[in-house]
Amino acid sequence: MTAYPQFDVILKALNLSSVGVIITDPEQKDNPIIFVNTGFENITGYAKEEALGSNCHFLQGDDTDKEEVAKIRHAINEKSTANVLLKNYRKDGTSFMNELTIEPIYDDHEHLYFVGIQKDVTTEHDYQLELEKSLTEIEKLSTPIVPIKENICVLPLIGSLTHDRFQHMSEYVSEYMDHGKEDYLIMDLSGLAEFNEDAVMNLVKFHGFMKLTGVELIITGISPKFAMTLIRYEENLASLTTYSTIKEALQFY
C-alpha cells in the first residue's frame, strides 16, 4: 500500500480520462515531463517512456504559433496559469490542434510543478475555419461586383450599409480593383432598405477611398428620401457624379 490509499484511485481516474494530462518539474533543467496519462499517449501517439524526461516542445513544429508558446513560457516564469491553442504534432507526423491549460501546483514541501491538460480540438478548429470561410463567401455574395463594359463595373447594394459591411466592401473592392482595369465603379443604391447618417458617412469615406485608387465613383438609384439625407453632406460629396439609374449612367460612359 502507498502512503496515500487514494493514490491508486486517482491514477486510475487520470488514465481513464480522454484528455491528456502532463506534469512537469520546472525546478529541474529544461522543465522535463515527469508524468503523462493514457490520454496523452492516445492523443500524441508517444508512449509514456518516450515522453518522460523530455520538454513538451518536442510536440511542436515550425508552424506552431510562437505567440502562444511565449504565453506558456511567461506563465511558467510567473508561476501562473495559461490557456493556449497550439498546433502540435503526433509521433506519426500528423498535426492536431491542442487546447492546452497549464496550472502551477505545489506539494507538501512547496516544490513547484506544472499540470498541463491537453484537449484535441482539431475537429472543432477545422469546423470553425470552414464556417469562417463560408461566411467570407456569403459576404462576397452580399457585395457583388458586376463587370458591364471593359472599363466599367457595377456594385449593387441591397439591405443596409452597416459599418461592418462598409469595411468588408472597402476591402473587397480594393482587392478587386488591384487586379482589374476599371476606370469607373457604379454603385447602385436602389436596393438599400435604409440610408441613415452612418450610411452617408460611409459613402463619404468610400468616395475618398475611390479617389485614391484613381477609379471614378458614380452613384445611381438615389431615392428622394436618400437625397434629402445627402443634402447635409453636399460639401463632402460635391464632386460625386450621380444618375437616376444604371441605364442612364451607361449612356454617358
UniProtKB/Swiss-Prot annotation:
Domain STAS, chain residue ranges per copy: 142-253
Record keywords, A-Z: Chromophore, Flavoprotein, FMN, Photoreceptor protein, Receptor, Sensory transduction, Transcription, Transcription regulation
Sites bearing S-4a-FMN cysteine, chain numbering: 56
InterPro entries, per database record: Bact_StressResp_Reg (IPR051932), PAC (IPR001610), PAS (IPR000014), PAS-assoc_C (IPR000700), PAS-like_dom_sf (IPR035965), STAS_dom (IPR002645), STAS_dom_sf (IPR036513)
PTM comment: FMN binds covalently to cysteine after exposure to blue light and this bond is spontaneously broken in the dark.
The protein's role, per its UniProt record: Exhibits the same spectroscopical features and blue-light induced photochemistry as plants phototropins, with the reversible formation of a blue-shifted photoproduct, assigned to an FMN-cysteine thiol adduct. Positive regulator in the activation of the general stress transcription factor sigma-B.
Record protein name field: Blue-light photoreceptor
